[in-house]
Amino acid sequence: MLRRLNSPTAILVRTASTRTEKLEEIRDRLSKGPNFQDFIQNSDNSKDDFENYDGKLRREKGETQQLRLPPWLKTTIPMGKNYAKIKSQLRDLKLSTVCEEARCPNIGECWGGGEHGTQTATIMLMGDTCTRGCRFCSVKTARAPPPLDVNEPVNTAKAISSWGLDYIVLTSVDRDDLPDGGSKHIAETVREIKARNSNIFVECLVPDFRGNLECVQTIAGCGLDVYAHNIETVEKLTPFVRDRRAHYRQTLKVLNEAKQFNPNLITKSSLMLGLGETDAEVEQTMLDLREAGVECLTLGQYMQPTKRHLKVIEYVTPEKFKHWEQRGNELGFLYTASGPLVRSSYKAGEFFITSILANRRKSV
């Protein structure tokens, strides 16, 4: 249901109709675009690697030796003109990216343009230092990070407009030291981006704001198109994987509130595999997300960033990831991206851009 507004009923009806049309347009682009498998390079080779690999994929209880990295998780070294260009622009504007801070294995493909030649980067707002210390994440932590850069919303919008993208992902560190968790800062950034290009799709991968629903509403009502918040792991493992201030049920509450406050948003979450979860627990997490109104889901392999972080319990096979993709579709997710190297913002821009181009060709 729409929230009650101080406006005539006729305006409410027109607003609801406009938002519904916008949502349907986004869904149409998603459904008519390529599926996730279209973006995987050398998929045939990956299948051969899986079928011929005889290495150990799971650590048994009590074992301390690290698992050997299977061939389907090996990626190329970041390089190329596009990669260098984006890195230079980000440094000049003093912007951070989760691609670098979280040591994403896809940085070379996304920044370099990959097979399809499209540059994709995920901007990380509010600095590079988080107030939380999740045991899977390599982003720096501190109780009192540096103050927010008041110029960041404008600088971010300038950078994005110069790249000419159709889709951009904004994420952020947690800022529990701020009264509003930085929600107003994120919302201002979205508005600056939309002011320069009203046609761009903006996805925000945001914190839980410690369950503060006013902060959730600030983001949900700022003009973004996709509200993302990651559940990360199954309920049983949450206390051991995420920071103590992050809670499984709180994540579901945040995602549900965003959807209830603005029903025309697409909501999205992400799940890491390989931390010791069972198939039944993964299934239940997917069901919980659907019940909370989540429409998009990504599943990827957890990879230990440093020796200080949680060890990998299991390297999940591409075949199993394919199973979860199919299960997500059966459960009614708008789309499910599931693969060993999938991350919450992996190839998001390229997905939408390719989809848009495909639709334009059909209409010619």
From Swiss-Prot:
GO terms for molecular function: 4 iron, 4 sulfur cluster binding; lipoate synthase activity; metal ion binding. Keywords: 4Fe-4S, Iron, Iron-sulfur, Metal-binding, Mitochondrion, S-adenosyl-L-methionine, Transferase. It comes from the Eukaryota. Residues 115-334 form the Radical SAM core domain. GO terms for cellular component: mitochondrion. It is an enzyme of class 2 (transferase). Binds 2 [4Fe-4S] clusters per subunit. One cluster is coordinated with 3 cysteines and an exchangeable S-adenosyl-L-methionine. Its cofactor is [4Fe-4S] cluster. [4Fe-4S] cluster 2 binds at residues 130, 134, 137. It catalyses: [[Fe-S] cluster scaffold protein carrying a second [4Fe-4S](2+) cluster] + N(6)-octanoyl-L-lysyl-[protein] + 2 oxidized [2Fe-2S]-[ferredoxin] + 2 S-adenosyl-L-methionine + 4 H(+) = [[Fe-S] cluster scaffold protein] + N(6)-[(R)-dihydrolipoyl]-L-lysyl-[protein] + 4 Fe(3+) + 2 hydrogen sulfide + 2 5'-deoxyadenosine + 2 L-methionine + 2 reduced [2Fe-2S]-[ferredoxin]. InterPro entries: Aldolase_TIM, Elp3/MiaA/NifB-like_rSAM, LIAS_N, Lipoyl_synth, rSAM. [4Fe-4S] cluster 1 binds at residues 99, 104, 110, 345. It is found in: Mitochondrion. Its EC number is 2.8.1.8. Residues 34-53 are annotated as: Disordered. Its main location: mitochondrion. Belongs to the radical SAM superfamily. Lipoyl synthase family. This protein may be expected to contain an N-terminal transit peptide but none has been predicted. This is Lipoyl synthase, mitochondrial.
